[in-house]
Amino acid sequence: MAPPAAALTPTVFFFCRLGDMVMVTRMLNLLHQRYGRPCQVIGTGSWTPTTYAGNPDVAGVWAFHRHLPFLLDAAWRPVRRALRDSAPGPVYVCERHFRQLPRIRRMLRLSGTDPRRCVFLSERPVRGPVRETDHLVDRLLALGARMPANLRSAEYPVPGTAALDGPRLYVLESERAERDAWLREQGYSGRELILVQPGNHRTMGPRRARWRRLNTDDKWWPIERWAQLLQRMHQAHPDAVLLLRGSKEELPLLREIQAATGLKSVGTVGTTLRQLYALCEAASSMVSVDSGPGHAAAALSVPLVVLYGAESPLYWLPRSPSGSPVLSAGGAPVSRRADQVSVDTVFSAWRSVAGYKRP
């Protein structure tokens, strides 16, 4: 009988926004099961390491600045060391962006990583939009099922789909305690909590005023429609707290929507991502534009409605690890802008998920 294969540490490169980094957690679970050790994750953005806090499929996380030359980045030396120390473990590159994929290839070359360890989602960098054929989670799982040239498939079989978990995020006990204390301070403790996420990466960015003035954000839904939706949600669940959530940069937008509702049951909060995850764990449902926080909510099993702009939910709809409902409103090919989606459509979708009882 052949001895069991030695456990290996997989390394995953993915230089993407929050939603993608949430969806990759199912692939991380596959790789952990397949190779016997949790993964090293290399991404971009200061928020990336905190996103994987408490995740048993992740051993370490490093994040580069997106536009700083990586040789000048503090993350470079520990990443180079981690790549060398994890040999002959596999390296999975989920990136295909025309700037980021060549950057990762340079990192691998300068770290001395054996090319036979590496498996790429795309051999060539991609510029501009791509016509997708499969959901991102499925594309990532297909990547994780591939075997690098330096290893043998028979020694590291791919776990069955039924054994996989995720996409999933985790909340720490200290974060639950902080959340519960905040809910008590606000007078929300013991009441149903419904989250609403009106913003996306454009509404929190430095050019947010310009996006709004020129009306060029395909994910923008007019203030009056958010107000009408919240009023109808309040009529359906009069005792619930309707909490408008965003980053601190989005608080003026949230307060504008709050004022337009004229409802005392509508609150606003600017949170960090970790605070958002804790709130999601306590929420009964959520309505979100197509954004990273929506993916986070689904990964924490929140019944969810996602309002789409130009993207297609066929390829980007958030997925839940528990089977909690996730419905889309709008998106290609039905519509190309969120403002083409009616309040009736979003409210009807929310009514469909709001009755789901979380375990």
Predicted regions and their residues:
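Catalytic machinery of carbohydrate-active enzymes
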Residues: 1-359
